[in-house]
Amino acid sequence: MKVLALRRSVAQVYADTQVYTHDDTKDDYENAFLISNLTTHNILYLNYSIKTLEILNKSGIAAVEIQSLEELFTLIRCNFTYDYEDNIIYLHDYSYYTNNEIRTDQHWVTKTDIEEYLLPGWKLTYVGYNGSDTRGHYNFSFTCQNAATDDDLIIEYIYSEVLDFQNFMLKKIKERMTTSLPIARLSNRVFRDKLFPLLSKKRQRILNIGPRNESMFTFLNFPSIKQFSNGPYLVKDTIKLKQERWLGKRVSQFDIGQYKNMMNVITTVYYYYNLYQKKPTIYMVGSAPSYWIYDVKQYSDFTFETWDPFDTPYSSMHHKELFSEKDIAKLKDDSILYIDIRTDRGNIDWKEWRKIVEAQTVSNLKLAYQYLASGKSKVCCVKMTAMDLELPISAKLLHHPTTEIRSEFYLLLDIWDISNVKRFIPKGVLYSFINNVITENVFIQPPFKIKTFKNDYIVALYALSNDFNDRTDVINLINNQKQSLITVRINNTFKDEPKVGFKNIYDWTFLPTDFNTTDTIITSYDGCLGIFGLSISLASKPTGNNHLFILNGTDKYYKLDQFANHTGISRRSHQIRFSESATSYSGYIFRDLSNNNFNLIGTNIENSVSGHVYNALIYYRYNYSFDLKRWIYLHSIEKADIEGGKYYEHAPIELIYACKSAKEFASLQDDLTVLRYANEIERYINKVYSITYADDPNYFIGIKFRHIPYKYDVKVPHLTFGVLFISDSMIPDVVKIMKNMRNELFEMDVTTSYTYMLSDGVYVANVSGVLATYFKMYNLFYKSQITFGQSRMFIPHITLSFNNNRTVRIETTKLKINSIYLRKIRGDTVFDMSE
């Protein structure tokens, strides 16, 4: 959903668009709630309130002020992520395909021959970091840039088994045009760039679990963040390999040597961060042309000092000469060294050239050892070739993708490796490594052992659901870690599957009720965005690979109506009931009938079941941005921080009724997941509320009326307005509450319209118009620890006779209250009040 705010209406008609005019009779929160439950994707919001826009954005729903038709046209035709704090819109708009172009935000790609392999007549355009160079295309009242690129497809091609780039891109673009937008992946980069600067300002130590290459630029600015990944491939791990020969396989049609070098250096930087938690100076030997340095500098400020007879245009300091052993002394501490020296073969005989390469490899390794031995805080990455070698068993082997698989690999060394045990590695084993192993991640830090860290902030985005992690350990971590942002895969199956397939692995699935947490927000991706100053125009799909975002220790926890709130709670219900259902009242009717309340007159107005809880349960796949458990808990301890809106406080019994309805709904739909979820929420309600029932009552509150429009043979026909189980010493407390509610009780709009047999031998008249007041009184009694109401649903009625009689229907008739009293069952009246 996207909300586009206008001061005046527009003449154009847009598909999937609805107009909402601000209602001045309602406050900003109520307007935001009503907007969020509209069913179209685009909302044109007229006569808007700035506060309402703020509320929507904090809820994760993109809401933007529009000043021109051009702005409106741009935003209505595509999806976007909105930084509502800095007023920046990141479009996810692939309409540039109509210009016969693909886009990249990696400069090195533009220096390759990739355009020779594009679709006929197509070109490649560089658009800068997150599309920053496209800002000049939009002369808008807000900052706007198109963050959509084809880098994901280019990188996927590099790691694929496919060689034909043109056919690969054609297939992927067609897929992109025929499937839904992977909005979370597109906006995740914006989210990470917002998240980690905010966390770093507030937190001393941050642990980040499971980063992938998509994050490799983001973390360059955060050397102190401790990363956990899948660990490195060590020299000693080659013991598992069988010897092989030279393969000579082409990986990419266009030259990706630049990519390989960039990945090697970034891997080395993160390895250095893990050891020393600070930025190094980057020395590079055999550097030309290293166009990728431009990309790294777009994200983070590094000093590059380079040596090569050819130019290295983006180096901070370039020495246009060969590097020699005597230059080692010039290299300072707190640095990394990347050695990428190799003589071009030219016309040299391959046997002669092989001798040169092997000699160069030995020389390179000697340079690396000398560099590491000469100072402190150093890491080296050195180019190697497959040959018989003695190598430190703890050295790290790297083999990032390059244009052709030949005999080249890289060795990552630290100062401890050079003094470690060395092992003889045959050439055939190194060929086996080169032929079969691709380094898929620049993060090669050790794996995370699932345990809590008392003083650290843990971030684990899409990292802990895999079934090689123990599910109980993951739950315990979330329950006990004081400060964290952790995602787990939501159980949106219908058969309550404990795990589901994802690519070539399996993920555990989770529901919010799997966790026993306090001071925690459990929400969706869009709900989480709102907490960190972002909003999004397209919410997560109800099915597929979606995640719960779990925030421990957030200062937003008590701000119940601002973050992870109830906006959009009825949207799915509205979509169904106004399109597919038997009547738009289907939900109301079902909730009453499933609780044995058969008086459906005014069912859409006089509710006995919490619609919030009911919708949050049966449609949780659509509205899990609403943190239901937090909502229940904060109400139970009376610490819900409500800033505004039309606020109705539910009685705890209304929540129980909602669970009962949801369970019956789930049974009819054969939805085992909702069935379990509703059962667990009901248990949670009973846990946090101390609900007691007057199933064996000794007092009741009665209401007598001036006139009953039916024949009756009981002595005093009355409405039993609830029963109580109290000691005589509690009577003054009950009377006090009755007196405090005097005006509301006498002002009830009580009506009746028919009679019926409540049970065999009990003939009654229906009563409408009292439930809202009943539940308000229930709440007051509950807070005073007075047992009021029974476990079965309260069905308001007036007993007319204890004989069987036929049903009588009359015009709806108002009943005028004569008196309201408290009376002991089979005893005397102890309190009476008249109007």
Curated annotation (Swiss-Prot):
Statement: the UniProt record of this protein carries the keyword Thylakoid: no
Region (GTase/RTPase activity): 556-692
Region (N7-methyltransferase activity), start-end ranges: 171-245, 429-555
Region described as 2'-O-methyltransferase activity: spans on this chain: 246-428
One MF annotation (Gene Ontology) recorded for this entry: RNA binding
Active site residues per record: 718 (for 2'-5'-phosphodiesterase activity), 720 (for 2'-5'-phosphodiesterase activity), 797 (for 2'-5'-phosphodiesterase activity), 799 (for 2'-5'-phosphodiesterase activity)
Alphabetical keyword list: GTP-binding, Host-virus interaction, Hydrolase, Inhibition of host innate immune response by virus, Methyltransferase, mRNA capping, mRNA processing, Multifunctional enzyme, Nucleotide-binding, Nucleotidyltransferase, RNA-binding, S-adenosyl-L-methionine, Transferase, Viral immunoevasion, Virion
Gene Ontology annotations of biological process type: symbiont-mediated suppression of host innate immune response; viral process
EC number: 3.1.4.-, 2.7.7.50, 2.1.1.56
Keyword GTP-binding listed: yes
Domain notes: Contains a bipartite N7-methyltransferase domain, a 2'-O-methyltransferase domain and a GTase/RTPase domain. The C-terminus contains a phosphodiesterase domain that degrades the 5'-triphosphorylated, 2'-5' linked adenylate oligomers produced by the host cell in response to IFN stimulation.
Function: Multifunctional enzyme involved in mRNA capping. Catalyzes the formation of the 5' cap structure on the viral plus-strand transcripts. Specifically binds to GTP and displays guanylyltransferase and methyltransferase activities. Has affinity for ssRNA but not for dsRNA. Capping activity is non-specific and caps RNAs that initiate with either a G or an A residue. Together with VP1 polymerase, forms a VP1-VP3 complex positioned near the channels situated at each of the five-fold vertices of the core.
Protein name in UniProt: Protein VP3
Taxonomic source organism: Rotavirus A (strain RVA/Human/Japan/AU-1/1982/G3P3[9]) (RV-A)
